[in-house]
Curated annotation (Swiss-Prot):
Segments of this protein annotated with the region Disordered: 344-374
Organism encoding this protein: Caenorhabditis elegans
Entry similarity comment: Belongs to the arrestin family.
GO biological process annotation, one example: protein transport
SUPFAM superfamilies, per database record: E set domains
Protein name: Arrestin domain-containing protein 15
GO cellular component terms, semicolon-separated: cytoplasm; striated muscle dense body
Length: 374
Protein backbone atom coordinates (compact mmCIF):
# COMPACT_ATOMS: atom_id res chain seq x y z
CA UNK A 1 0.00 0.00 0.00
CA UNK A 2 1.63 3.29 -1.06
CA UNK A 3 2.18 5.94 1.53
CA UNK A 4 -0.55 8.54 1.95
CA UNK A 5 0.65 12.13 1.87
CA UNK A 6 -1.31 14.90 3.55
CA UNK A 7 -3.99 12.36 4.55
CA UNK A 8 -5.14 11.92 0.95
CA UNK A 9 -5.66 8.54 -0.78
CA UNK A 10 -3.65 7.81 -3.96
CA UNK A 11 -5.40 8.45 -7.25
CA UNK A 12 -6.46 5.85 -9.81
CA UNK A 13 -3.67 7.00 -12.13
CA UNK A 14 -1.10 6.14 -9.46
CA UNK A 15 -2.48 2.61 -9.14
CA UNK A 16 -2.40 2.15 -12.93
CA UNK A 17 1.24 3.28 -13.16
CA UNK A 18 2.24 0.84 -10.40
CA UNK A 19 0.33 -2.01 -12.06
CA UNK A 20 1.96 -1.29 -15.44
CA UNK A 21 5.44 -1.22 -13.93
CA UNK A 22 4.77 -4.65 -12.39
CA UNK A 23 3.16 -6.45 -15.36
CA UNK A 24 5.25 -5.13 -18.29
CA UNK A 25 8.45 -7.00 -17.29
CA UNK A 26 6.45 -10.26 -17.14
CA UNK A 27 5.07 -9.72 -20.64
CA UNK A 28 8.50 -9.02 -22.06
CA UNK A 29 9.83 -12.38 -20.86
CA UNK A 30 10.34 -14.53 -23.96
CA UNK A 31 8.58 -17.91 -23.76
CA UNK A 32 10.99 -20.75 -24.51
CA UNK A 33 9.96 -23.24 -27.22
CA UNK A 34 10.20 -27.01 -26.72
CA UNK A 35 13.24 -28.58 -28.34
CA UNK A 36 12.02 -32.20 -28.53
CA UNK A 37 9.06 -33.98 -30.13
CA UNK A 38 7.85 -37.54 -29.51
CA UNK A 39 5.87 -39.84 -31.78
CA UNK A 40 5.40 -43.60 -32.20
CA UNK A 41 5.14 -45.99 -35.15
CA UNK A 42 3.16 -49.21 -34.56
CA UNK A 43 4.06 -52.48 -36.25
CA UNK A 44 0.31 -53.25 -36.55
CA UNK A 45 -2.80 -51.11 -36.03
CA UNK A 46 -3.95 -53.43 -33.23
CA UNK A 47 -2.28 -56.04 -31.06
CA UNK A 48 -3.60 -59.43 -30.02
CA UNK A 49 -3.68 -60.37 -26.34
CA UNK A 50 -0.98 -62.92 -25.52
CA UNK A 51 1.35 -61.60 -28.21
CA UNK A 52 4.17 -59.05 -28.21
CA UNK A 53 3.38 -55.40 -28.76
CA UNK A 54 6.02 -53.94 -31.08
CA UNK A 55 6.51 -50.24 -31.74
CA UNK A 56 9.18 -47.64 -32.38
CA UNK A 57 9.43 -44.41 -30.40
CA UNK A 58 10.57 -41.52 -32.60
CA UNK A 59 12.38 -38.64 -30.89
CA UNK A 60 13.25 -35.46 -32.76
CA UNK A 61 15.72 -33.22 -30.89
CA UNK A 62 16.93 -29.75 -31.88
CA UNK A 63 19.08 -29.04 -28.81
CA UNK A 64 22.70 -30.31 -28.92
CA UNK A 65 23.04 -30.09 -25.14
CA UNK A 66 20.15 -32.42 -24.24
CA UNK A 67 21.10 -34.88 -21.50
CA UNK A 68 18.61 -37.62 -20.62
CA UNK A 69 17.71 -38.09 -16.97
CA UNK A 70 15.01 -40.69 -17.66
CA UNK A 71 13.30 -41.86 -20.85
CA UNK A 72 10.63 -44.55 -20.44
CA UNK A 73 7.49 -45.97 -22.06
CA UNK A 74 4.55 -47.04 -19.90
CA UNK A 75 1.63 -49.18 -21.09
CA UNK A 76 -1.59 -49.24 -19.09
CA UNK A 77 -4.87 -51.04 -19.64
CA UNK A 78 -7.79 -50.14 -17.37
CA UNK A 79 -11.43 -51.21 -17.49
CA UNK A 80 -14.05 -48.97 -15.90
CA UNK A 81 -17.80 -49.30 -15.41
CA UNK A 82 -20.11 -46.84 -13.72
CA UNK A 83 -23.59 -45.36 -13.62
CA UNK A 84 -26.15 -43.84 -11.25
CA UNK A 85 -29.29 -45.78 -10.34
CA UNK A 86 -32.13 -43.37 -11.16
CA UNK A 87 -34.45 -45.00 -8.60
CA UNK A 88 -32.14 -45.06 -5.57
CA UNK A 89 -29.55 -42.39 -6.56
CA UNK A 90 -26.83 -44.87 -5.68
CA UNK A 91 -23.52 -44.55 -7.50
CA UNK A 92 -22.07 -47.75 -8.94
CA UNK A 93 -18.49 -47.84 -10.22
CA UNK A 94 -15.73 -50.41 -10.68
CA UNK A 95 -12.18 -50.17 -11.97
CA UNK A 96 -9.92 -53.05 -12.97
CA UNK A 97 -6.32 -52.92 -14.18
CA UNK A 98 -5.31 -55.45 -16.83
CA UNK A 99 -1.77 -54.31 -17.62
CA UNK A 100 0.61 -51.79 -16.04
CA UNK A 101 4.20 -52.14 -17.19
CA UNK A 102 7.10 -49.81 -17.87
CA UNK A 103 10.31 -50.10 -19.91
CA UNK A 104 13.38 -47.86 -20.08
CA UNK A 105 14.23 -46.62 -23.56
CA UNK A 106 17.77 -45.41 -22.83
CA UNK A 107 20.18 -45.07 -19.92
CA UNK A 108 20.31 -42.05 -17.65
CA UNK A 109 23.04 -39.58 -18.59
CA UNK A 110 22.82 -40.25 -22.33
CA UNK A 111 23.55 -37.19 -24.46
CA UNK A 112 21.16 -36.84 -27.40
CA UNK A 113 22.63 -35.15 -30.48
CA UNK A 114 20.56 -33.03 -32.82
CA UNK A 115 18.41 -35.07 -35.19
CA UNK A 116 15.91 -37.93 -35.23
CA UNK A 117 16.32 -41.01 -33.04
CA UNK A 118 14.48 -44.36 -32.88
CA UNK A 119 13.95 -46.52 -29.80
CA UNK A 120 12.34 -49.97 -30.23
CA UNK A 121 9.71 -51.11 -27.72
CA UNK A 122 8.57 -54.71 -27.20
CA UNK A 123 6.10 -55.58 -24.44
CA UNK A 124 4.12 -58.79 -24.04
CA UNK A 125 0.38 -58.24 -23.60
CA UNK A 126 -1.14 -60.62 -21.00
CA UNK A 127 -3.35 -63.36 -22.40
CA UNK A 128 -6.35 -62.43 -20.23
CA UNK A 129 -6.57 -58.83 -21.47
CA UNK A 130 -10.05 -58.05 -22.86
CA UNK A 131 -10.65 -56.14 -26.07
CA UNK A 132 -10.67 -52.37 -26.28
CA UNK A 133 -14.22 -51.11 -25.85
CA UNK A 134 -16.06 -47.79 -25.49
CA UNK A 135 -19.65 -47.23 -24.38
CA UNK A 136 -21.86 -45.12 -22.15
CA UNK A 137 -21.68 -47.34 -19.07
CA UNK A 138 -18.13 -48.64 -19.33
CA UNK A 139 -14.90 -48.71 -21.26
CA UNK A 140 -11.70 -50.71 -21.63
CA UNK A 141 -8.87 -48.43 -22.66
CA UNK A 142 -5.22 -49.09 -23.37
CA UNK A 143 -2.62 -46.38 -23.71
CA UNK A 144 1.11 -45.92 -24.07
CA UNK A 145 2.71 -42.96 -22.29
CA UNK A 146 6.20 -41.90 -23.38
CA UNK A 147 7.92 -39.50 -20.99
CA UNK A 148 11.30 -37.81 -21.38
CA UNK A 149 12.95 -36.02 -18.47
CA UNK A 150 15.99 -34.11 -19.64
CA UNK A 151 18.47 -31.55 -18.35
CA UNK A 152 16.26 -28.63 -19.39
CA UNK A 153 12.55 -27.97 -19.20
CA UNK A 154 12.45 -27.25 -22.93
CA UNK A 155 13.79 -30.72 -23.73
CA UNK A 156 11.49 -32.53 -21.28
CA UNK A 157 8.15 -33.71 -22.68
CA UNK A 158 5.57 -36.50 -22.52
CA UNK A 159 2.95 -37.86 -24.91
CA UNK A 160 0.05 -40.32 -24.51
CA UNK A 161 -0.98 -42.58 -27.42
CA UNK A 162 -4.14 -44.78 -27.43
CA UNK A 163 -3.72 -48.46 -28.30
CA UNK A 164 -6.16 -51.07 -29.62
CA UNK A 165 -5.98 -54.55 -28.06
CA UNK A 166 -7.99 -57.54 -29.28
CA UNK A 167 -8.96 -60.63 -27.28
CA UNK A 168 -7.29 -63.80 -28.54
CA UNK A 169 -9.93 -66.42 -29.44
CA UNK A 170 -10.14 -69.24 -32.01
CA UNK A 171 -12.68 -71.60 -33.52
CA UNK A 172 -10.93 -74.33 -31.50
CA UNK A 173 -12.31 -72.73 -28.30
CA UNK A 174 -15.98 -72.89 -29.29
CA UNK A 175 -18.25 -75.95 -28.94
CA UNK A 176 -18.28 -78.34 -31.89
CA UNK A 177 -22.00 -77.90 -32.54
CA UNK A 178 -21.38 -74.18 -33.15
CA UNK A 179 -19.59 -75.10 -36.40
CA UNK A 180 -22.53 -77.21 -37.67
CA UNK A 181 -25.63 -76.09 -39.61
CA UNK A 182 -28.65 -75.12 -37.56
CA UNK A 183 -32.36 -74.70 -38.27
CA UNK A 184 -34.08 -72.51 -35.71
CA UNK A 185 -37.86 -72.88 -35.61
CA UNK A 186 -40.40 -70.94 -33.60
CA UNK A 187 -44.14 -70.32 -33.64
CA UNK A 188 -46.05 -67.28 -32.44
CA UNK A 189 -49.76 -67.68 -31.63
CA UNK A 190 -52.04 -64.65 -31.78
CA UNK A 191 -55.09 -64.76 -29.52
CA UNK A 192 -57.63 -62.14 -28.51
CA UNK A 193 -60.03 -62.79 -25.64
CA UNK A 194 -59.00 -66.48 -25.70
CA UNK A 195 -60.03 -66.70 -29.37
CA UNK A 196 -57.28 -67.95 -31.72
CA UNK A 197 -56.47 -65.64 -34.63
CA UNK A 198 -53.83 -67.79 -36.26
CA UNK A 199 -50.18 -68.67 -35.97
CA UNK A 200 -46.94 -67.44 -37.55
CA UNK A 201 -44.19 -70.03 -38.14
CA UNK A 202 -40.59 -68.83 -38.29
CA UNK A 203 -37.58 -70.72 -39.59
CA UNK A 204 -34.00 -69.42 -39.73
CA UNK A 205 -31.25 -71.56 -41.28
CA UNK A 206 -27.53 -70.92 -40.71
CA UNK A 207 -24.48 -72.85 -41.88
CA UNK A 208 -22.93 -72.33 -38.42
CA UNK A 209 -23.25 -70.09 -35.37
CA UNK A 210 -19.55 -69.29 -34.86
CA UNK A 211 -17.89 -66.62 -37.00
CA UNK A 212 -14.76 -64.51 -36.92
CA UNK A 213 -14.67 -60.74 -37.17
CA UNK A 214 -14.81 -59.55 -40.76
CA UNK A 215 -16.93 -62.50 -41.94
CA UNK A 216 -20.43 -62.31 -43.37
CA UNK A 217 -23.34 -64.22 -41.86
CA UNK A 218 -25.59 -65.79 -44.48
CA UNK A 219 -29.07 -66.76 -43.33
CA UNK A 220 -32.17 -68.16 -45.00
CA UNK A 221 -35.42 -66.97 -43.42
CA UNK A 222 -38.79 -68.63 -44.03
CA UNK A 223 -42.00 -67.10 -42.66
CA UNK A 224 -45.37 -68.83 -42.88
CA UNK A 225 -48.06 -66.33 -41.94
CA UNK A 226 -51.30 -68.20 -41.23
CA UNK A 227 -53.10 -65.20 -39.73
CA UNK A 228 -55.57 -62.81 -41.32
CA UNK A 229 -53.23 -59.84 -40.87
CA UNK A 230 -50.03 -59.10 -42.69
CA UNK A 231 -46.64 -58.69 -41.05
CA UNK A 232 -44.89 -55.35 -41.40
CA UNK A 233 -41.29 -54.17 -41.00
CA UNK A 234 -39.78 -57.65 -41.14
CA UNK A 235 -36.04 -57.32 -40.52
CA UNK A 236 -33.01 -59.42 -39.66
CA UNK A 237 -30.64 -57.75 -37.21
CA UNK A 238 -27.16 -58.41 -35.85
CA UNK A 239 -27.16 -57.23 -32.24
CA UNK A 240 -24.27 -56.84 -29.81
CA UNK A 241 -25.36 -57.25 -26.19
CA UNK A 242 -23.08 -55.89 -23.48
CA UNK A 243 -23.45 -56.65 -19.79
CA UNK A 244 -21.78 -54.27 -17.33
CA UNK A 245 -21.11 -55.00 -13.68
CA UNK A 246 -20.26 -52.39 -11.03
CA UNK A 247 -20.25 -52.09 -7.24
CA UNK A 248 -21.94 -49.45 -5.11
CA UNK A 249 -19.69 -47.08 -3.19
CA UNK A 250 -20.90 -47.65 0.35
CA UNK A 251 -22.95 -50.87 0.51
CA UNK A 252 -20.49 -52.74 -1.78
CA UNK A 253 -23.37 -54.41 -3.61
CA UNK A 254 -22.90 -55.47 -7.23
CA UNK A 255 -25.37 -54.39 -9.89
CA UNK A 256 -25.56 -55.35 -13.55
CA UNK A 257 -26.77 -53.37 -16.53
CA UNK A 258 -27.54 -54.66 -20.04
CA UNK A 259 -27.19 -52.59 -23.21
CA UNK A 260 -27.92 -53.51 -26.83
CA UNK A 261 -26.28 -52.07 -29.92
CA UNK A 262 -27.44 -52.61 -33.50
CA UNK A 263 -24.48 -53.66 -35.64
CA UNK A 264 -26.21 -54.28 -38.98
CA UNK A 265 -29.74 -54.78 -40.26
CA UNK A 266 -31.28 -56.26 -43.41
CA UNK A 267 -34.88 -55.12 -44.04
CA UNK A 268 -37.00 -57.91 -45.51
CA UNK A 269 -40.18 -55.96 -46.17
CA UNK A 270 -43.65 -57.33 -45.43
CA UNK A 271 -45.41 -60.70 -45.46
CA UNK A 272 -49.04 -60.80 -46.58
CA UNK A 273 -51.77 -62.61 -44.67
CA UNK A 274 -52.08 -66.36 -45.23
CA UNK A 275 -48.85 -66.35 -47.19
CA UNK A 276 -45.55 -68.22 -47.02
CA UNK A 277 -42.38 -66.37 -48.02
CA UNK A 278 -38.73 -67.39 -48.13
CA UNK A 279 -35.90 -64.85 -47.97
CA UNK A 280 -32.64 -66.27 -49.29
CA UNK A 281 -29.11 -64.99 -48.82
CA UNK A 282 -29.67 -62.49 -46.04
CA UNK A 283 -26.11 -61.24 -45.56
CA UNK A 284 -24.96 -59.41 -42.44
CA UNK A 285 -21.28 -58.56 -42.11
CA UNK A 286 -19.41 -58.46 -38.81
CA UNK A 287 -17.25 -55.30 -38.85
CA UNK A 288 -13.48 -55.66 -38.57
CA UNK A 289 -13.46 -53.20 -35.66
CA UNK A 290 -16.10 -55.11 -33.65
CA UNK A 291 -14.85 -56.71 -30.42
CA UNK A 292 -15.14 -60.52 -30.31
CA UNK A 293 -17.35 -62.40 -27.87
CA UNK A 294 -15.99 -61.91 -24.37
CA UNK A 295 -16.35 -64.06 -21.26
CA UNK A 296 -18.48 -66.74 -22.93
CA UNK A 297 -16.33 -69.79 -22.10
CA UNK A 298 -14.58 -68.95 -18.84
CA UNK A 299 -15.09 -71.86 -16.51
CA UNK A 300 -12.74 -70.77 -13.73
CA UNK A 301 -15.33 -68.55 -12.09
CA UNK A 302 -13.57 -65.34 -13.13
CA UNK A 303 -16.12 -62.66 -13.87
CA UNK A 304 -15.59 -59.80 -16.28
CA UNK A 305 -16.90 -56.32 -15.56
CA UNK A 306 -17.79 -56.04 -19.28
CA UNK A 307 -19.16 -59.12 -21.07
CA UNK A 308 -19.96 -59.03 -24.80
CA UNK A 309 -22.34 -61.36 -26.65
CA UNK A 310 -23.89 -61.41 -30.13
CA UNK A 311 -27.34 -62.52 -31.32
CA UNK A 312 -29.09 -62.76 -34.67
CA UNK A 313 -32.57 -61.32 -34.18
CA UNK A 314 -35.63 -61.58 -36.43
CA UNK A 315 -38.26 -58.92 -35.77
CA UNK A 316 -41.63 -58.05 -37.30
CA UNK A 317 -44.78 -56.19 -36.42
CA UNK A 318 -46.94 -56.93 -34.59
CA UNK A 319 -44.91 -58.34 -31.70
CA UNK A 320 -42.67 -60.94 -33.35
CA UNK A 321 -39.14 -61.33 -32.05
CA UNK A 322 -36.79 -64.32 -31.92
CA UNK A 323 -33.04 -64.63 -31.38
CA UNK A 324 -30.21 -67.02 -32.21
CA UNK A 325 -27.06 -66.67 -30.05
CA UNK A 326 -23.82 -66.31 -32.01
CA UNK A 327 -20.15 -66.62 -31.13
CA UNK A 328 -17.68 -64.17 -32.67
CA UNK A 329 -13.95 -64.92 -32.46
CA UNK A 330 -10.94 -62.82 -33.38
CA UNK A 331 -9.21 -65.62 -35.35
CA UNK A 332 -10.09 -68.78 -37.24
CA UNK A 333 -8.55 -72.14 -36.39
CA UNK A 334 -5.29 -72.19 -34.45
CA UNK A 335 -3.72 -74.76 -36.77
CA UNK A 336 -2.85 -73.04 -40.10
CA UNK A 337 -3.44 -76.28 -42.07
CA UNK A 338 -6.88 -76.68 -40.52
CA UNK A 339 -7.67 -73.04 -41.25
CA UNK A 340 -6.55 -73.45 -44.88
CA UNK A 341 -8.77 -76.53 -45.29
CA UNK A 342 -11.70 -74.68 -43.74
CA UNK A 343 -11.19 -71.72 -46.08
CA UNK A 344 -10.95 -74.07 -49.07
CA UNK A 345 -14.26 -75.66 -48.04
CA UNK A 346 -15.89 -72.22 -47.87
CA UNK A 347 -14.57 -71.25 -51.29
CA UNK A 348 -15.85 -74.51 -52.83
CA UNK A 349 -19.29 -73.97 -51.30
CA UNK A 350 -19.45 -70.43 -52.70
CA UNK A 351 -18.31 -71.65 -56.12
CA UNK A 352 -21.04 -74.32 -56.20
CA UNK A 353 -23.70 -71.80 -55.25
CA UNK A 354 -22.56 -69.27 -57.85
CA UNK A 355 -22.41 -71.98 -60.55
CA UNK A 356 -25.95 -73.11 -59.75
CA UNK A 357 -27.20 -69.53 -59.90
CA UNK A 358 -25.47 -69.00 -63.24
CA UNK A 359 -27.11 -72.10 -64.72
CA UNK A 360 -30.49 -70.94 -63.46
CA UNK A 361 -29.97 -67.53 -65.04
CA UNK A 362 -28.98 -69.08 -68.39
CA UNK A 363 -32.06 -71.32 -68.41
CA UNK A 364 -34.32 -68.42 -67.57
CA UNK A 365 -32.83 -66.26 -70.31
CA UNK A 366 -33.25 -69.01 -72.93
CA UNK A 367 -36.89 -69.42 -72.01
CA UNK A 368 -37.52 -65.69 -72.04
CA UNK A 369 -35.80 -65.18 -75.39
CA UNK A 370 -37.68 -68.01 -77.12
CA UNK A 371 -40.65 -66.43 -78.99
CA UNK A 372 -42.65 -69.63 -78.53
CA UNK A 373 -42.99 -68.91 -74.81
CA UNK A 374 -43.89 -65.25 -75.23
Amino acid sequence: MPEVSNGRRPSVATFLRQFASTIIPLVNVKQSMPTTQINIVLAEPRCMAGEFFNAKVLLDSSDPDTVVHSFCAEIKGIGRTGWVNIHTDKIFETEKTYIDTQVQLCDSGTCLPVGKHQFPVQIRIPLNCPSSYESQFGSIRYQMKVELRASTDQASCSEVFPLVILTRSFFDDVPLNAMSPIDFKDEVDFTCCTLPFGCVSLNMSLTRTAFRIGESIEAVVTINNRTRKGLKEVALQLIMKTQFEARSRYEHVNEKKLAEQLIEMVPLGAVKSRCRMEFEKCLLRIPDAAPPTQNYNRGAGESSIIAIHYVLKLTALPGIECEIPLIVTSCGYMDPHKQAAFQHHLNRSKAKVSKTEQQQRKTRNIVEENPYFR
